[in-house]
C-alpha cells in the first residue's frame, strides 16, 4: 500500500476536532482537512459527560467526508486522542533472565512491556507503555535490540487513565456511530513527538499543554518521558474569574482572548473606549495565570529536578498558550527559556486555510497514527466501468436492454440527473457491500438514510412506460426512413 487515509478525533473541553490526512511510505503526512465543532460542558477534564458528543463527532465526520479530498468516501474508523485529568504516569522496573547468552530481540522487549503493563494498577486502563532506560547484564544500554546478554532490565513509564474515559469513547463512537476506534493515542506524548526537537528531548526539557480545563506537564530526559502529570486547571479558570466583573462567560472569553495580558499591568487604570477597564481585567488575568504557572514550575521539584537539569527549556502548546504575555510570565517564574511549539517539516498542510499552529493537538494524533501498523479509516465506492458509446445505426444493441430499470430511467431525462442517480446507486451498493462483509459503517440520521427510490411502480405502469418508450423509438425510425428521410440518400 503506497498511501492511506487516516482520520483522527480529539474530544476537548471546549470543542470536538477531527482531521484527515494521507500518509505515504516515505513518512510524509499530508493533512487534507480539519473540522471542529464548538461544545461546552459535554466533556469535562477529558471525560465525556453528555451523549451530545456523539452528534458533534458525526457532524465533524460528515464535513470531513464533504471535503474535496474525501469526496464520496465514508469514514469507517478513527484514531482517538486520550488525555485529561485522570491521565498519569507511573515508573515500573521489570527484568527478565535468559537461559543463556543470546541476542536481544524485539520480542524480548515486548515481553518486558507486557510485564510492566501487568504490574500497573489493575483498577485503571493502560494507555501506553514507554521505555525510559534499558540494561543488559546490569550495564546501561540505549538500544538493546541486536546486542547479546543473559539478562535484560528496563524502567518503563506506564501511562494509565480512568476506565470511564475509554468506555465513554467506545459508547459515543462505536456503539452510537458504528465507526471503529482503530487505536487510542496519548495526546501529550503525540504532541511532544510532533513539536520537540531531538536535542530538546535528549538534553532534557519540559513540555506544557495549556488547555481549557487541564494543563499537562511532561518532562523529557535522555529522549524518554521521565515525568508526566495533568493539573486540573486551565485557561477557562481565567475566563470564569472575569465573570465576577459582571460579564457572561462568552463575553468574558472574548475579552480575555482579545485584550487579556498575563503580565502585570503597568501605570494607572484607564477605561477603554468601550467602557471596559482593561487594567482591572488584566489584574484578574495576571493573578490566575500566575497561580497556574506556579503549579507548572512546582512539577520540577516533584520530579526531583532543577531548572539546570533541563537545558532544552520549556515548550508550550495548547489554546491557553495564545494568551498574551503567558510565555513571558512562565519564563520569568521558571528562569528557563520558553518557546511556543510548532508543527515540524514532516507534516504538509494541503489546505492554505488551515493554520497548523492552531491544530497541533489533532495533527499530532494523525502523525502518531501514521507510525502505527497500516489500517484504513476511509472507504471509497468501487469504480464502475463507463460503457462505450454505441456506434450510429446500431439500433438493436443500443436498445437491447431498454426494458432494464436503470437503462429505462435514462430516456427522457437530463444528463445531470442521470449522473446523480448513478452516484446514488454506487453509494448504496458500496454501503450494502460493507454491510454484507461485516465492515463497520457509520450510522446516518434518518433524513439522510432514507434516500428516495421509486420501488412502488406496478407491473401495469412499467408495461405502460415500456410501451411508450418503444412507441417513441418506432416514430423516430419512421421519421428517418420515410419519404423526407429518403432525400438524404439521393
Name these PLM-found stretches:
Residues 9, 18, 80, 173-174, ...:
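Residue-level signature of catalytic and energy-coupling elements of molecular machines
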Residues 227, 316, 320-363:
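Nucleotide-binding motor/catalytic cores of P-loop/tubulin-like NTPases across gene-expression machines
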Residues 63-67, 119, 176, 245, ...:
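Conserved, well-folded catalytic cores of nucleic-acid-processing
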Residues 147-148, 198-221, 227:
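Phosphate-binding/catalytic loop of phosphoryl-transfer enzymes
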Residues 1-15, 19-77, 82-204, 378-490:
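Nucleotide/phosphate-binding catalytic cleft detector across ATP-hydrolyzing
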Residues 70, 84, 158, 163-167, ...:
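Phosphate-binding glycine-rich/basic clefts of nucleotide- and phosphate-handling proteins
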Residues 342-396:
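Glycine-rich phosphate-binding/hydrolytic loop that grips phosphoryl groups
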Residues 72-83, 303-319:
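Short glycine-rich phosphate-binding loop at a beta-alpha junction
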